[in-house]
Amino acid sequence: ITVAFPTNILEIETINVLASKIHLNLCVENMEVLLFLEKHLESPVGVFMKIDVGYNRTGVDSDDASLIQDLLSQMSGIPFINFKGFLGHAGHSYQCRSKEAVEAVHQKSKEKIIQLKTKYKAQYPNLILSLGDTPSCSVSEDFEGIDEIRPGNFVFYDLTQNIIGSNELDAIAVA
């Protein structure tokens, strides 16, 4: 199970309970959380580095090579952390109002995260790229280079998705 939003350190007890029972993946976007996990984890977890692919709300800027390298270096020395890869969420796709606009956001987001895999795949050959948001997963068919997609509420849809252009009204599954 991947908790696909930044790790909340106030949930460390729950994290430790879950990690002792399942294969748990967390998201990290800063050194403070990583250092906290280093001191408080009691069981192994996978860690995705949360990458900002353009929404500018959460995640490490995909161009911040120094911070990315610092986080990777720190992770490599933590016994209970297994670096899984890079994870992105194109939250800015929700501001789109056409399929073409969603596709443009998706392609740009995909490009940013794939550049990281290209840079780090020799050092981390099993690196996973995880990318997803409901609008992009609804509209785009091009996920080449992405290992895992996270379609959000794709199976239900709603009026917001209809306004964005992700679906037709008759595809809304929840009233």
Description of each model-found segment:
Residues 100, 104-175:
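Active-site anion/phosphate-binding pocket segments in diverse small-molecule metabolic enzymes
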Residues 1-96:
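Active-site-proximal beta-alpha core segment in soluble small-molecule metabolic enzymes
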